[in-house]
Amino acid sequence: MHDSTACQDDGSVREQWDRWFRVGAILVLALAAVNLFFRLDREVVTEWDEALYAISAAETARNGNWIGTTFDGALDYYNTKPPLNIWLIALSFKAFGVTLVTLRVASALAAWLTVLVLMLWARRAFGATTALLSGLVLSATYGFIYVHSGRSANTDALFTLLVLLTVVTLWGGRDHPWRLAWLGPVLAAVFLLRGMAVLMPLILVVTVLVVGGRRPGERRWPALTAALMLTVLPIAWWAWARWRLDGWQFLGPMFQYDFVARTATPLEGHTGSLLYYPNNLQKDHYVWLIATAVAIFLFPLSRERFRRLWSELSGNAYAQTLAGAWLGVTVLIPTMMQTKVAWYLNPFYPIFALLVGRMFAQGFACASASSAAWRRRVLTGTVLLALAIVEGKLFHYSYTMRDVRHTVQGLLLEERQTLAGQRVYQDRWMRADRFVLEHVIGGYAREAQGVGGFVLAARRGDYVIVPQPDGDGSEIVLVRANRRHRLCRRAD
């Protein structure tokens, strides 16, 4: 489909973007790869919820507990989500070993594929200009990269990809009804990943199919029947296997706690007002919002321009319903829930990138249609400056807030060969630190209070981690230190 933006150029700019789409897409995907994979092994494992998935996946890979996943060797009833994310991480561990990269590679790959899918679909739906600019924005969206998402082992990156695939499948199903059958595997994957969070894409599907209407004589029921079967069968297989293991001990809380309680009450202190998510959006993504405001200032939206901004949707009730439902479920559902956390906004980021990219595309179309070349240069500079600022923010966050070097985990990883098979003591082990020691390095975590407790409990050659400046004395010998901690060995 051609790129029909709010301003009509002579076709030269549109043709130029089309001609350079492949090169531009490669560059955008390269940027996304850098932002998602660079230093993936040099960032600290977080306590919530990355460490929970890490330990359960490592135990699954080691012990084969694929149906009833465990935590510290016992069936896990705290994490009430189905096991797809644990399965993916465990398969990565079995294939390539337990490392910080294999822990996160499934999420990082899912986020990278989200950028790819958004660009390929947006080119068909809205043209090359919108596609490339949307992909660029999404590749450098802080929340999409860091907030429980692409660079962590949590479920949110894959969930965002699956919601986007739901939108793409519904869009394609308008002209090719049998493509709706793909909704089955997508919805099944969402349930096996996030349980009752499947309601978000399910509400989207029902809204579009019921409200959006259909063409006269169109037969959807064979494809929708296939979709229903492909949704139910994988879910029923896993639910039956889990029920045979422990009855309703897991399945009951999966519904009651992870859906009813999370929706009706603010769990674990995660509260917020109706402005919680708008506030998070402006706090984390003010650079792209300011750049969008500059584009609107340079090329003001008259009534005619605003009407034609999304001309591809004009006169198409199905597409309009899909666009409205996509925006609605990704914004209204998290807002209505009583439990509010920043990463519930992750499925919204592809449509956020599409909206921002479309405004930039409109600006470039207007610039080509007018004689004000300086506005085009200002808009180009604004987009590039915004990208540079966001990239700087991402790298700064990686090197300062998430850097593993000055943590307990960094100390352990620097001495991984020394500590393999050894006992290491600490006052209290955090889950994330224990995962690194026991599953990445192959050591054994033990607890003792202070240097005195360590000396009493330890054997000759055991190790202890103490905060700076502790660790001096005849009973222990310094092995390595960073800014905050010391790794010491009991003196022979």
Question: Where are the language model's segments positioned?
Answer:
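Membrane-interface transmembrane helices that cradle and orient dolichyl/undecaprenyl
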Residues: V13-R14, R124, T129, V163-W182, ...
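Transmembrane-helix signature of polytopic, membrane-embedded enzymes
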Residues: F21-V28, L118-T141
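Extracytosolic helix-loop segments that constitute the early lumenal/periplasmic catalytic or substrate-binding loops
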Residues: V34-F38, L52-Y77, L84-W87, L91
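Transmembrane-lumen/periplasm boundary regions of multi-pass, lipid-linked membrane glycan transferases
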Residues: Y53-E59, P185, A189, L193, ...
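Transmembrane-helix motifs of polytopic, lipid-linked glycan transferases
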Residues: V105-F126, L165
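Specific aromatic-rich, kink-prone transmembrane helix
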Residues: V117, L158-D175, V186, F352-L355
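Hydrophobic/aromatic-rich transmembrane helices and adjacent perimembrane loops
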Residues: Q338-A369
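Short periplasmic/luminal acceptor-recognition loop of GT-C membrane glycosyltransferases, typified by
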Residues: A386-R490
